[in-house]
């Protein structure tokens, strides 16, 4: 069926508004629960979808730089003490780590969808890593 253009139509009167009963009017004018307004809440999933769109658009690093740097230094300490890192080296490690994690979560999400679920679980991560050949 072809779409047609809608044009504005002039109102032709209609019904006149009826007067409300006294109790209804009093109930509507008085604020609910002593004037305390509830904070606005979005429906479940709305904020999650908004965050997904925002993070897919962005290119900035998602893990904070200093905590990641401390983690790198802590892991490197097991191999050799008093190691020094150039800032560009830590940045390259962080880029690689985040790219790996994003890819792993994409594959994990596919595993969850394949199982007819929308929630990812540890078994999805294990399956994704096993298919990739990272873990036997």
Swiss-Prot record:
Sites of N6-acetyllysine modification: 10, 15, 19, 24
GO CC annotation: nucleosome; nucleus
SMART domains the UniProt entry points to: H3
Residue(s) carrying N6-methylated lysine: 5, 10, 19, 24, 28, 37
UniProt entry keywords in alphabetical sequence: Acetylation, Chromosome, DNA-binding, Methylation, Nucleosome core, Nucleus, Phosphoprotein
Region described as Disordered: spans on this chain: 1-43
PTM note: Acetylation is generally linked to gene activation. Can be acetylated to form H3K9ac, H3K14ac, H3K18ac and H3K23ac. H3K9ac could compete with H3K9me and prevent gene silencing. H3K9ac is restricted to euchromatin. Methylated to form mainly H3K4me, H3K9me, H3K18me, H3K23me, H3K27me and H3K36me. H3K4me1/2/3, H3K9me3, H3K27me3 and H3K36me1/2/3 are typical marks for euchromatin, whereas heterochromatic chromocenters are enriched in H3K9me1/2 and H3K27me1/2. H2BK143ub1 is probably prerequisite for H3K4me.
Phosphoserine PTM sites in chain numbering: 11, 29
Subunit structure: The nucleosome is a histone octamer containing two molecules each of H2A, H2B, H3 and H4 assembled in one H3-H4 heterotetramer and two H2A-H2B heterodimers. The octamer wraps approximately 147 bp of DNA.
Protein name stated in the entry: Histone H3
Native source organism of the sequence: Griffithsia japonica (Red alga)
High-level lineage: Eukaryota, Rhodophyta, Florideophyceae, Rhodymeniophycidae, Ceramiales
